[in-house]
Amino acid sequence: PHYRSQAYYDSAPWRATWKGEGGGVLLNQAPHGIDIFTWLAGLPVRVMAKTRTRRHKIEVEDEASAMLEYANGAIGYYHTSVNEWPGGSYMELCGETGKIVIANGKLRFHTLETPIQEFTEKNDQMWASPPLREEEVVVEETESGHKAIIRNFARAILYNEPLLSPGVEGVVSLEFINALVLSGKKNEPVEIPVNRDEYDELIEELKKRSKAKKVSGPTKRITDPHHLV
């Protein structure tokens, strides 16, 4: 996600509070990337997360990391932060016959000529590695950003146009986020689907302890310039 300074969080009393936002980087800045991540990899069945407030004077987390376990035995790792600049987005999906890398808007395929397990078992050369083919996938540019989603939503209402992002898909990302928040606060592994009663109890307790921030001057309502296109 994009970097955030203390001035951003101090722009309104509700920002970065459990009562006002209900979460930090995971719920506010990270969901766009989490949407893509869970769309490609699906939901894990278990997470072990570490959430912390590292550089800001706020109630909620500004950084989160997690080890992920999937039903098929795969292991994943997730990290997000608003403490880094320059920021960026990087995602890898590794499989039996290669790897997909998505980095800062570019997509690359790394295709193995021999499946990794087969090469590992049959190769007799000490320092050999499987031959591979690399290619960058040119993705056709389309209208994107908030403007495109809002236009699509309006056209769905007016003309029954299929939604690009149906609301039900957001539930998957929210389940992922809730699991990391719960695991981070408990400091122990959490199963997915999340125990609803346990999560609700945690959020209610955090909201009770939540306090609105004191801000100097009027509340600022300025759109993130990254989302104006």
Predicted features and spans:
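Predominantly a Rossmann-like dinucleotide-binding segment in NAD(P)-dependent oxidoreductases
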Residues: 1-57, 187
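A general structural signal for well-ordered alpha-helical segments in protein cores
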Residues: 33-34, 146, 150-151, 177-178
